[in-house]
Amino acid sequence: MGAITFSHIGFHVRDIEKMERFYTGLLGLTVTDRGPLDTPLGRLPFVFTSSTPQEHHQVVLAGGRPDHVPFNVINQLSFRMEDFATLRALQRRLPEF
């Protein structure tokens, strides 16, 4: 099986400005991109951040999380793999967990 590396994580947040201040001010991430994107929930603000110029984004903040809707704030956890065969090998191992 080939190498698997972390790619990025996305959070659906209520207050995107506050979360941007947290990730940039406290954790030292840099905003690499921003803007509204069309989603199944409508057009939402996004902020892409990274700790390294080699990565467009490592932490993605998606605004528009409703206060009254209880759901998981982690939208995705993404990894990179060397090839599709690595993904298939990982898929075969899932029942072990």
Language-model features, listed with the residues they occupy:
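Short helix/strand-bridging catalytic loops that position acidic/His residues to coordinate divalent metals
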Residues: 37, 75-76
